[in-house]
């Protein structure tokens, strides 16, 4: 382990439109090369598209999508006597959120729609209905943890 002190948690301000900290974190993850205004346009555009398609509050759909994507357990490598075991461990809440956001954005970037706004809105809608690549990623992680349940006594 590192002997240095843990990095300080940075304060994340709520976004201007919804007043939600999670939306800001999502926006920051979408952002490339410090272009926050572009990321803002993409995220708000996607949420507006969702509202137009579903006639539901977009924040509710967004939170549902994120809940459906966040993993509860994952596997971590642990070396024991020359063998490396994949040990299932619970995911702490901050990491759950970070992974969920990351998987949603990665899945959206891999889609075939024309603009990033359309891709993101489609992936969020899919994830809120328990479909899509981001949900598949979560299922794969859970399946991997379930398959390696025999090694759970190696947890630390």
Swiss-Prot record:
It comes from the Bacteria. GO terms for molecular function: rRNA binding; structural constituent of ribosome; tRNA binding. GO terms for biological process: translation. PROSITE patterns: RIBOSOMAL_S7. GO terms for cellular component: small ribosomal subunit. The keyword Ribonucleoprotein applies. InterPro entries: Ribosomal_uS7, Ribosomal_uS7_bac/org-type, Ribosomal_uS7_CS, Ribosomal_uS7_dom, Ribosomal_uS7_dom_sf. Keywords: Ribonucleoprotein, Ribosomal protein, RNA-binding, rRNA-binding, tRNA-binding. It holds the Pfam family Ribosomal_S7. Part of the 30S ribosomal subunit. Contacts proteins S9 and S11. One of the primary rRNA binding proteins, it binds directly to 16S rRNA where it nucleates assembly of the head domain of the 30S subunit. Is located at the subunit interface close to the decoding center, probably blocks exit of the E-site tRNA. This is Small ribosomal subunit protein uS7. The gene is rpsG.
């Amino acid at each position: 382990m590192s002997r240095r002190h843990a990095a300080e948690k940075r304060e994340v301000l709520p976004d201007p439109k919804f007043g939600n900290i999670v939306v800001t974190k999502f926006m920051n993850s979408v952002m490339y090369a410090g272009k926050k205004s572009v990321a803002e346009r993409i995220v708000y555009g996607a949420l507006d598209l969702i509202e137009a398609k579903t006639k539901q509050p977009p924040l509710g759909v967004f939170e549902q999508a994120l809940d459906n994507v966040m993993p509860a357990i994952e596997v971590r490598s642990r070396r024991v006597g020359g063998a490396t075991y994949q040990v299932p461990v619970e995911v702490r809440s901050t990491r759950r959120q970070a992974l969920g956001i990351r998987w949603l954005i990665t899945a959206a970037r891999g889609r075939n729609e024309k603009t990033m706004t359309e891709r993101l809105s489609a992936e969020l809608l899919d994830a809120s209905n328990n479909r899509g690549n981001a949900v598949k990623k979560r299922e794969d992680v859970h399946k991997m943890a379930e398959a390696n349940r025999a090694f759970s006594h190696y947890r630390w």
